Amino acid sequence: MATSYNVISPEVPQHYPPFSLSRLLTTVFHPKGGERVCILIDLDDPTKVKDFAFLNDPQWSIQRYAHDVFYNGLKNGVSQELNFQGGEFYAYQITGGSNLDMPDAAFAPDGRQLSFEKDIYPHYDLILCISTFSATAPLTAWAKKFGFRGATMHGMNQTILETGLSVDYDTVSAEAEKLRLGMTRADWVEIDFAINGNTHTLRLVLNGQEAQKSHGLCRGPEPDIANLPAGEIYYTPEGAEGEFPLKNEHDGTLSLTKVSGGRIVDVSFISGNEETVKAHQQKLREDPATGDLGELGFGTQLLPFSGRDIQDEKIRGTIHVATGRNDHLGGGFTPDKFKKAINATHDDILFAPHKTPEINIAQVRMQRDGKQEILIENYLPAAYMKSLVE
């Protein structure tokens, strides 16, 4: 029976090529042969990697994909086909937050404890991280220090495997570049959020900066980390003003954030649990850097919703802003800006019809080259955005 996917528009395909680990690694990395590769996962108790004991616990479904699809895939032919070396599997203590720095301790299935900095980063050319929490930011920093390449694929599920990791990333890259060229060097972007009959507008100041793309290709000698599934145009805002509604991921509480000077400075209650809003207010008071708006991102791909932000933020018609660190994106919000290390996260706030049905993205517009262009209306690409990829 054919799988029926949840899509944002009829333009999204319902059929994709079968997943191929060999094709994915070849397209993303263009390996020359001889590269030493390893796989990383996160666990609440990383010693559970011994004898792959974590496979007996159904809560580690993401990590099971790392073992069943990637580790076994390499071992059962892909390493030989691509002339890879290694193929080892390591676990580390789960960080508990998106893009928090990783611990140095790594654990192997044979029970050994190793050091990432001494035993792993210097000795691998390609590192694949399949985890619960994103490790893109810390791995990007380590890649620059030690010269390896890699990919982060947090939150993996079957839909992601069958769709977002099965597409042709040469095509994804080409389309992302077309969109980037039509959106780069914008002066600002304004987003109109509609909720409960009211419209709230957030302006993100870009000052003509060069737009960047997450396009899935990580080729050549330069150290880099691809975030997969890919397909995104993004900026690191230089300022922001206005307000926007926020839906809490844990309990669905809706609040209205006030933004000034590029950061969230206050938050007020709309509906749900008032204690959730009070906790957010307290966090902003204690560690103001947690409110910094470090990213504005637009999805570029025609993909189905997976229920995981890692894919869903890459869908054309969705938009996300992110708070916190953005050094992995070329921004200046580094972990040392935060009063508490545990707060130095990069948290995407995704607006998509399946995730935030209470909030409509009525319009997104861009000021560029002296004129305004409408990019998105009601979660669908507007004529200008469509024209960039036709």
Name each region found by the language model:
Residues 186, 252, 259, 264, ...:
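A broad structural signal for short, well-ordered beta-strand segments within beta-sheet-rich domains
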Residues 233-278:
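Oxyanion-binding "anion nests"
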Residues 1-243, 248-249, 363-390:
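Active-site bordering "gate/hinge" segments
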Residues 266-335, 366:
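Dual-mode signal for accessory low-complexity, basic/Gly-rich regions
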Residues 138-141, 162-165, 203-206, 214-217, ...:
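A short secondary-structure junction signal
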Residues 240, 253, 292, 315-317, ...:
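A generic structural signal for well-ordered coil/turn residues at beta-strand boundaries
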Residues 315-321, 325-389:
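Internal helix-turn-beta structural module
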